[in-house]
Design a protein with these regions (language model features):
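Radical SAM [4Fe-4S] cluster-binding motif and immediate context
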Residues: 1-117, 122, 135
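C-terminal accessory regions of radical SAM enzymes
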Residues: 113, 128-197
Length: 197
């Protein structure tokens, strides 16, 4: 309700007509999305929405996407991450390549643009996996794609695995993160840093 009140204020008093929903979990609660979209539709606002930072593909269905389009959505970013199923499985993404293709297709059928996020340099990844990722990005009906280098984040299982295997040093992790995701903070044994760059 607070978000709707803020949108009302910004729309009415400041003439704002476009809103970025920066919430990775926005589509996780379908009932909330339905309620939110219906509230916007009932207001009859001339308004546009997008999710530029990404939502989970496995939360999307045609009913939700159609309602979002009716409420003013024009664009979704989605975290696809890899075109390699073994890499997706190791990341515990709970998606498969077939699902990626299906979900991107229904997003487009609902009339929304799609932007994809991908990660390269994941610990189990090979050059062949990276080629599969690039090929998937080219194959999908995306308006754009962002390829970020893998960054092992402290507190994650993959960070701990890399520390335990001697691939990174825990005390040096701040050096890894004084950079952008375009920088290479870690490179798998079989892929030189220069190749990832």
């Amino acid at each position: 309700d607070n978000v709707l009140m803020e949108i009302d204020l910004l729309y009415r008093d400041y003439g704002i007509r476009e809103f970025y929903i920066v919430d990775d979990n926005f589509t996780a609660d379908k009932a909330m999305v339905k309620k939110f979209c219906n509230e916007i539709i009932n207001r009859k606002y001339d308004i546009a929405f997008c999710n530029p930072n990404g939502v989970r593909l496995d939360t999307l269905d045609m009913e939700m996407l159609t309602l979002m389009k009716k409420a003013g959505w024009y664009y979704l970013s989605v975290g696809i991450e890899s075109g390699s199923q073994p890499v997706l499985d190791h990341m515990k993404k709970r998606i498969n390549i077939t699902l990626v293709r299906e979900k991107v297709s229904i997003i487009r059928k609902a009339g929304l643009e799609v932007y994809g996020f991908f990660i390269v340099g994941y610990p189990t990844e090979t050059l062949e996996d990276i080629k599969k990722t690039v090929n998937l990005a080219l194959e999908l009906d995306l308006i754009g794609a962002n390829f970020s280098c893998f960054h092992p984040l402290p507190g994650t299982a993959i960070f701990e695995m890399l520390v335990q295997n001697g691939k990174i040093k825990r005390e040096k992790f701040t050096e890894l993160f004084n950079s952008t995701y375009a920088d290479v903070a870690y490179s798998p044994d079989n892929i030189p840093v220069k190749t990832l760059k």
